[in-house]
Each structure stands twice: as structure tokens, then as C-alpha cells.
């Protein structure tokens, strides 16, 4: 079976065609400074690139004729990888942090939960406030809603309600997200 491995196929999909791999008869050629040299046959363009000691790289195959550029492929590949790393570094994954409590919570414990939620929101994460019921406590959903609304009010300067208090099985949950500045 002559099937290529997944890794090889993926590598070939990502890497642009260079030098002899370019099979088009006519191509639009761009030099190292970015100016257009005109339309050449693939073999002429390859000769020009090799005489300059550089590579012929297919930039866009969707245009008619396809666009190729004379560049040092090693430097080009390094620059592309560096751009991808920078883009990955700048993106921030938002996670949901959970703060659990009971509807009968003491003042000090409540303040600890508020401080936890405050730190999570400052870090750019969403907060899932979870009021847990046990046994017959499920009858006191109004008290849990009041507690969650109080929490939302106490954190209103840094957060906004993404999901209002709602019953979720034996729990009452509310999701807060950081305010967009």
C-alpha cells in the first residue's frame, strides 16, 4: 500500500510548492524586493531564482496565472513560524472557574468566595457561582437566588451576568464574565 502517513500528508498540505515542484506552465514572477517581473514559464523563473542563489516559492495558486516569488525559502519558513508563534502567544483562552457555597453561608465565608471570584475575574476568567443544596434544602431556591444576586451586585464593578441564576439539578448556578473595558 502506497498511502502516505498522516504526518507526511499534513506537511505537504502546509508547505508551499518550491522550485521543481511547481508544475504550472506560466507563472507571474515577483522578485525579492516585491516588484513584479512579469509572466514567465516555470523553467525560466526557476533559472532566474537559482542564478540569484534563492528559491522559487509558490505564493498564490488561485490567481491566474499563479504567483511565485523569488526568496530564500529557509528565511521565509522561519518568518512564517515566528508569526504563528506570536499569534498563538497573544491569544488568551478563557476558562470557567467555579466558586461553590451553600445558601446558608456565614459572612466571612461569603467574603472569601467574593475575593476568590474577584481574583478569577481580574485574571480574565469567567466565574460559575454554584449554590449547592442537600436533601430538603432544595425548597429554599429563593434564598439561593437572593444570594447569587447579592454576589452579582457585589461584583458588578468588575463583572456582568452572562447567565442569570438558574436551577441545575440540585444546584443553583450563575455565570459571571469580566466586563469588557
Curated annotation (Swiss-Prot):
Q: Which GO terms describe its biological process?
A: ribosome disassembly
**Predominant location category:** plastid
Subcellular location per the Swiss-Prot or TrEMBL entry: Plastid, Chloroplast
Superkingdom is Eukaryota
Please list the GO terms describing molecular function.
Answer: ribosome binding; translation initiation factor activity
- Keywords, ordered alphabetically: Chloroplast, Initiation factor, Plastid, Protein biosynthesis
Matching Pfam families:
IF3_C, IF3_N
GO CC terms in record: chloroplast; cytosol; membrane
Report disulfide bridges, numbered on this chain: none
**How is this protein organized at the quaternary level?**
Monomer.
Q: What does this protein do?
A: IF-3 binds to the 30S ribosomal subunit and shifts the equilibrium between 70S ribosomes and their 50S and 30S subunits in favor of the free subunits, thus enhancing the availability of 30S subunits on which protein synthesis initiation begins.
The Swiss-Prot or TrEMBL record describes its family as follows: Belongs to the IF-3 family.
Q: What is this protein called?
A: Translation initiation factor IF-3, chloroplastic
Amino acid at each position: 500500500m502506497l498511502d502516505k502517513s498522516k504526518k507526511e500528508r499534513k506537511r505537504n498540505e502546509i508547505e508551499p510548492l518550491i522550485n521543481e515542484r511547481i508544475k504550472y506552465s506560466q507563472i507571474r514572477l515577483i522578485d525579492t524586493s516585491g516588484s513584479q517581473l512579469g509572466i514567465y514559464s516555470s523553467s525560466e523563473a526557476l533559472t532566474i531564482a537559482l542564478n540569484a542563489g534563492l528559491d522559487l516559492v509558490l505564493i498564490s495558486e488561485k490567481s491566474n496565472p499563479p504567483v511565485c516569488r523569488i526568496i530564500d525559502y529557509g528565511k521565509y519558513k522561519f518568518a512564517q513560524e515566528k508569526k504563528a508563534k506570536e499569534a498563538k502567544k497573544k491569544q488568551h483562552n478563557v476558562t470557567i472557574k467555579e466558586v461553590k457555597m451553600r445558601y446558608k453561608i456565614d459572612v466571612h465565608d461569603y467574603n472569601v468566595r467574593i475575593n476568590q471570584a474577584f481574583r478569577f475575574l481580574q485574571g480574565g476568567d469567567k466565574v460559575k457561582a454554584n449554590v449547592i443544596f442537600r436533601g430538603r434544602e432544595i425548597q429554599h431556591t429563593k434564598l439561593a437566588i437572593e444570594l447569587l444576586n447579592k454576589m452579582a451586585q457585589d461584583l458588578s464593578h468588575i463583572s456582568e451576568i452572562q447567565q442569570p441564576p438558574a436551577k441545575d439539578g440540585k444546584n443553583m448556578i450563575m455565570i459571571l464574565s469580566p466586563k469588557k473595558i
